Amino acid sequence: MKLQLAIDLLDKEEAAKLAQEVEEYVDIVEIGTPIVINEGLPAVELLSKSISKAQVLADLKIMDAADYEVSQAVKFGADITTILGVAEDASIKAAIEEAHKHNKELLVDLIAVQDIEKRAKELDEMGACLLYT
């Protein structure tokens, strides 16, 4: 099991400072969707450059253009990127391939998925290794 800190409502500098203060106690630091919307991928980059022990998760909630969006998250320092479980299979497969190409991880967020058990099995067959409900 891994402990994850989600940071959603700070600016990127405050988020980086908080992450530095807690990184020895957590495994993953998440830059939440609100920060990414407000500050863009440079927020991921600043966090990535500010910590060295914990993984950086970019909560992008990708729906389409998945391989491109994962490549950009990785470029800015994300170790883990999120995609929505309701995205098309082709998008999820492309995101998984892109993440794995860079030795990074993809987390599939099961928000709004109606049949979680069925979708989890489908995602497992696609090669997804991290699921979140």
How would you label these PLM feature ranges?
Residues 47-95:
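Glycine/small-residue-rich loop that forms an oxyanion/phosphate-binding "nest" at active or ligand-binding sites
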Residues 108-116:
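Active-site glycine- and acidic-residue-rich loops that bind
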Residues 27, 79, 129:
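Receiver (REC) domain switch/active-site residues of two-component response regulators
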